[in-house]
Amino acid sequence: MTLMTRRRAVFAGALATPMLARHGWAQGSYPGKQIRMVVPFAAAGTTDLLGRIVAQYLTEQWGQQVIVDNKTGAGGNVGAELVAKALPDGYTLLLGTVGTAVTNQYLYKNMPYDSVKSFAPVALVGEVANVLAVNPSFPAKTLPEFIAYCKQQGPNKVSYGSPAVGGTGHLAMEYLSELAGIKVEHVVYRGSSLVMKDLLAGHILTTMDNLPPYLQHIQSGALRALAVSSAKRWFSAPEVPTVAEQGYPGFDAAPWWYVAAPAGTPTDIVKKLSDEITKGVKSEAVIKKIRDAGAAELAGDSAALAKQMETENVKWKKVIEAAKLEPQ
């Protein structure tokens, strides 16, 4: 079964969320009514699929339907703002990204919410690797060779494609460039499919982008993967070394997802959500669904999520400032 087929199966299965409880809750206890999971990106993307996986799991466990509501725009800010301004009663949740949690505040003017103060962290859910991939005609076969080639060619003589300014691929390459002492030219595309099309055709020779869409072309030999950006080798491409093991220890630029509630949500509700979601993300059934969606499980309770946000904020603020990316 291909990744696309698995992703479609996940999407279809999650849409068919069961309405009946495995076990009930006493009247008046949380949750006592339908819960809304706001996903700030379009349907059928990875963020949406993870939101549906979490929603389906909670519905099955609690017997109250958790519906997914896609509210797109402004790199996730539209949906995140909706949750930030919702009643803090546990019935409106956010399936957020590293953008809504950390990087958007440095990339957008007039942010409609505070990335930290507007939310109560609930739980981590998953992550995905970026991949540094090249057309086979590119002279480098390893990351050290890529770095050496970029230095030999000179600043901005080597270009790479990614689907967004300030996107996870762009920031991962800026992070690597800062550590390696290179400067590469960023070519912005309107989506990963267009990057991949030009990369396969040789119109552009390099990309840093989320791994899943490129995986089949890497496995077929149509593209060459030089490194993944995750802290450890990726489960679906274990033959591809990490950036960290090729001379940059500690390098980790894996985009991640989480669940949050509006600030002021009662702590007992946050804890109940955190405990249940964390248990789910550790379960074999949910892990399989997350991996079928192209991501990997990243379990962590509300305290772990708060720590993740703090650590990532320090890292990405420094990277964005070094890259001189101005808020738009």
Task: Please describe what each predicted stretch is.
Residues 1-15:
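N-terminal secretory signal peptides and thylakoid transit peptides that target proteins
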Residues 25-116, 156-157, 182-205, 297-299, ...:
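N-terminal (or domain-start) structured segment
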Residues 21-23:
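N-terminal signal peptide c-region/cleavage motif recognized by signal peptidases
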Residues 101-110, 175-179, 206-240:
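A ligand-binding cleft/hinge motif common to bilobed small-molecule-binding domains
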Residues 85-91, 106-194, 243, 256-289:
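Hinge/capping helix and adjacent helix->loop/strand transition within the periplasmic-binding protein
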Residues 95-100, 104, 162, 192, ...:
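Beta->alpha turn/N-cap motifs
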Residues 32-34, 219, 242, 267-328:
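An extracytoplasmic/periplasmic, membrane-proximal ligand-sensing/linker region
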Residues 44, 98-99, 135-140, 162-167, ...:
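Short coil/turn segments
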